[in-house]
């Protein structure tokens, strides 16, 4: 005799606070993981990070990004390591406008420092990352002569000798390696077509590589914590126009201005986003990529967050946003095909390509009434005013099509709507077509607002 489970008698089991925290975290980062998969990130970091003992933590984080399907190009710097090599050789070098004049002794020191650093980085990736979340992961790192360089030459009477600039990046070979699931590692050295070696800057190599690859992100992990505003507060987001204006003002520190100049150059060359984040904060690259506000400064071509009408491309993001609220009964479950059918009714808030809020307007023109449905804001952005913005946007859409009233059906957010001008109504106040669809088992409250 077949056993029929008594599912109707099974009470839901509430998760522990730790379990709920984990579920909430995973739901919050899932849209980012989906959006960043198969995207190309060029990540530049200075030798100062290695000297500070942060290489192991960074490699662990990079391995995690790689495992999530992101294409990674790493560019390391080596200035403090070059200084150590010069000290061993009892050699002093000259800096002009922050650029080292690389004589023969300095070039040998740069080669030695870059070679040792490259081997240290490769060895760290090859250790199977013991005692980390990526323990046992097999990660291939490739290096090569991907960078063609040219001399800086003589500038204002100063011969920079073996100091160089990037002439060309072998983007095709790098892309081939990335497509084969390799991490590409570049050093701050380049070679001319005749085989002459040049000492380069990490920032120049990273910027030109990101431009050549049309990378989705250029990320500098540096001693600079980010870009500060005029009162010393971190600017989490900047448009490229604002970044250029900050450079024109001339009030930034020399190091900050240096990085920002390279960021602007990269974005003018086709890079979509750029980040400046501190290496002193353990896990800063993960926090920057997977937290809404990040921990450094992100620069984009336009303002990162904007409210717009939804398209079919947004259906997946809306589904991810509303699924948790459907699961706990806050929202009525919606089939994906119905979302696709009704997508023109939806408005969304997008931030860096991720959907963080949505709401829909269903008009009933005969009665001059509209229903606002599916008002949802991501948990990590609640309290920032996004719900208010969506409400005002839906009200504006309703007025634009001649509606006089707006109603919502809710079981849990009554007071939020009452504070914003809605009043209690009855099922009889609903348009006839909507009244026929009212769910008497759910018994949602009807709230109405005059527009």
UniProtKB/Swiss-Prot annotation:
Keywords: Acyltransferase, Amino-acid biosynthesis, Arginine biosynthesis, Cytoplasm, Transferase. Its EC number is 2.3.1.1. It comes from the Bacteria. InterPro entries: AceGlu_kinase-like_sf, Acyl_CoA_acyltransferase, Asp/Glu/Uridylate_kinase, GNAT_dom, NAGS_kin, NH2A_AcTrfase. It catalyses: L-glutamate + acetyl-CoA = N-acetyl-L-glutamate + CoA + H(+). The keyword Acyltransferase applies. Residues 305-451 form the N-acetyltransferase domain. Its main location: cytoplasm. PROSITE patterns: GNAT. GO terms for biological process: L-arginine biosynthetic process. HAMAP family: N_acetyl_glu_synth. In bacteria which possess the bifunctional enzyme ornithine acetyltransferase/N-acetylglutamate synthase (ArgJ), ArgA fulfills an anaplerotic role. This is Amino-acid acetyltransferase.
